[in-house]
Amino acid sequence: MKLNQTIPISLIYFLLTIFLCFFGVSTTNAAEKTNSILKVENFFKNLKTLEADFIQVSPSGKTSEGKIFLDLPGKLRIDYNQPNNILITSKGFWIVIQNRKLKSTNNIPLNQTPFSILLENKINFNNKDLIVDLEKILGIIVLKIKLAENKQAGELILEFSEKPFLLKKWIIRDLVGDETTVLIQNAKYNQKLPFTIFFPDDFPEPNN
């Protein structure tokens, strides 16, 4: 007798989930995690400056492009291409967010943002102030970092290729789970950057 049975959709999703768990995400033991975390620390220890193009994907799926500059420790510039009018800078202590079209400036304490993790004077993930988790997904090292005492800052997720060991992407996940993804392209490492690029724009005072 021939049986004609339809496999439930829920069972198909369940089997796909099991497949991805076993074949997509590598099991990472404690020693492997420690070794990979040390690799990330060494990457930032040896990173003096970074200049790169980026593509940003917002939680709604909207994309923006621009240039990013890092000069560690402490200095950051994220300069968006038009039609995005946003400029983000930091020289330590504050993140300055400016809208060039509106000529507006907002200052946010650095330690209230995930950027504080990247801009530390000495990055140490074996730190009671951080909650750190690591996994490998299809050959990509994924490091998830939260500030233990400031959950309002959200979560920073760093993704690295293994060979060569390079930063490819970071994701900022907020308290409600919305993610902003930044893809790094055409990176140049450890080249001298002018200090002045980390200053915010100087908008003229409005006329009374």
Residue ranges and their predicted role:
Residues 2-15:
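Bacterial N-terminal signal peptides that target proteins for export
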Residues 12-24:
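Bacterial N-terminal signal peptides
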Residues 28-32:
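Boundary at the C-terminal end of the N-terminal hydrophobic targeting segment
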Residues 42-61:
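A short, Trp-centered hydrophobic/proline-enriched beta-strand micro-motif
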Residues 44, 112-126:
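Short, solvent-exposed helix-to-loop capping segments enriched in aromatics
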Residues 58-60, 101-103, 176:
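Solvent-exposed strand-loop boundary residues in beta-sheet-rich modules
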Residues 67-117, 180:
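An acidic-aromatic
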Residues 126-207:
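Gly/Pro-enriched, hydrophobic low-complexity segments
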